[in-house]
């Protein structure tokens, strides 16, 4: 038919393939962009799905949810419960790692509608002979669809002319027949949801993890010498004691010699300069090789196993870029852009230039071979025992590539996790998460005011973002010494650590710069560290005076003891009269043990009144209640809703309260 549209004609037909199908499945939720992208969950959770399903008129409908793991051929179907207003709900357990597929199926329940009509007629002594014949016809349709022999036997009995009308009616009223029909419905005119709902089910570390980043080359037992994996094994007990369960290593590959950067990112390197680990590749190897000064592949595997002995996983940095002397440039020149003068195009982000890094050309005609090779890098390191990858600058590679490669890896290695390091525009940042990244760096690093933190957390913990984006909060990185940490006292480092570790269930620090409170920038107005470890070997005194290792260990210990801190979305902000005091509750419904956190966001002593409603966490508001500060091991007694707080950052910049009343912790 012709449809006028803003002055021009559009041809459109709304003729369905089968107009007899009357069910409408209008919405399934939760979903990401109308099920274009997978939801994120962890193993052991219960997946709750709702849908709007209805039909014209007043007839009863049946709605089922079907689900399966993609490794399984068979679907499991469960009935959905009607909640009212044409909303339906069902839930099922997520028992396997990997990818689940979900669809909704609906149909008119003609037999149930007929049965209700029959009961009404029988109650009013109406003639039901014709209605019984109609019912038998409906049962025959059910049998034609399901081919259930048991249902066929019931139909034959109902058609037995030796039975009286009353006897047939009693057979029809038998609850077992109704149950049998429900198991064998006539779904010849059923409707399925147009797009399947996919769910990435990951292991619990996708939801709760504590990351510690360090440069292995800086940990030789001889100051100034290049460290090795063997020497780094001595760090593991202290890292574990601080409460970290992921050790993240910057790239461990050979570093290019051409255009190598010197100290503080100098354009000209001296012969002694070690270069940036992100300038990957030399004559000694590329992305599947280990820098010879770090040790051998066997040394690396031993380091991974040793870390596991302390409950720590090793995460590797995957940076899909090359130095100018990476073997790929000779072996696959088509994977790079070449300038008219015959030189390769190095990386640029004007006005910044990265002469020591050459990006891949993802528009190459040989793109499929490039994609397969990059996938093989993940597989290679998975085979060395690595199951967590921090991906460098994924926003500079096509999103279609990430969707493909993460799906491929997740299908074959479902326990693999991916952290996206993309400090970029919000839609691009979220777009990467939608395509499968388990966790993502965030803008937390630049949120310094209480109002900014509140607004940002509300964004991250609200639909639709909460369904696909898992934040990982980092107060610092080798590239970023945020302004509020520059020249800051240890109390500010403690404050940012408490925020990162209690706002988000996933967080990380770059150490030992963080716990040693390194606070000197390259120059005023810059976020880079002075004498950045990216470009030189450092010698660290890990136990130097003023370090906050014990404080970090205490916070991480509290995180492990209290499930409320092992989720991100379960946050509720509390109002107060001082904008420099940030207060919030973390709780898991049904688990008890809610926590109240109050953080001083300034460098000065702050005080104010907090409006906390004790009944919101199950406490009796008519009685006093106790708050035990898990950081200071001090207990306070509060009364009612408004209570006074004073925080001296030099003593401790935060309260982390556990709530109790009459000697019992909050239910």
Curated annotation (Swiss-Prot):
Gene3D superfamilies, A to Z: Glycosidases, Golgi alpha-mannosidase II, Immunoglobulins, Phosphotransferase system, lactose/cellobiose-type IIA subunit
Keywords: Carbohydrate metabolism, Glycosyltransferase, Transferase
Binding site for alpha-maltose 1-phosphate: 261, 321, 356, 393, 534-535
Site (Transition state stabilizer): residue numbering on this chain: 479
GO biological process, one term: alpha-glucan biosynthetic process
Pfam families: GLGE_C, GlgE_dom_N_S
Uppermost EC category: transferase
Catalytic activity: alpha-maltose 1-phosphate + [(1->4)-alpha-D-glucosyl](n) = [(1->4)-alpha-D-glucosyl](n+2) + phosphate
Active site residues according to the UniProt entry: 392 (nucleophile), 421 (proton donor)
Domain of life of the organism encoding this protein: Bacteria
Enzyme Commission number(s) of this protein: 2.4.99.16
GO molecular function, one term: hexosyltransferase activity
Functional description taken from the UniProt entry: Maltosyltransferase that uses maltose 1-phosphate (M1P) as the sugar donor to elongate linear or branched alpha-(1->4)-glucans. Is involved in a branched alpha-glucan biosynthetic pathway from trehalose, together with TreS, Mak and GlgB.
Membership in a protein family: Belongs to the glycosyl hydrolase 13 family. GlgE subfamily.
HAMAP family given in the database record: GlgE
Subunit structure: Homodimer.
Protein name: Alpha-1,4-glucan:maltose-1-phosphate maltosyltransferase
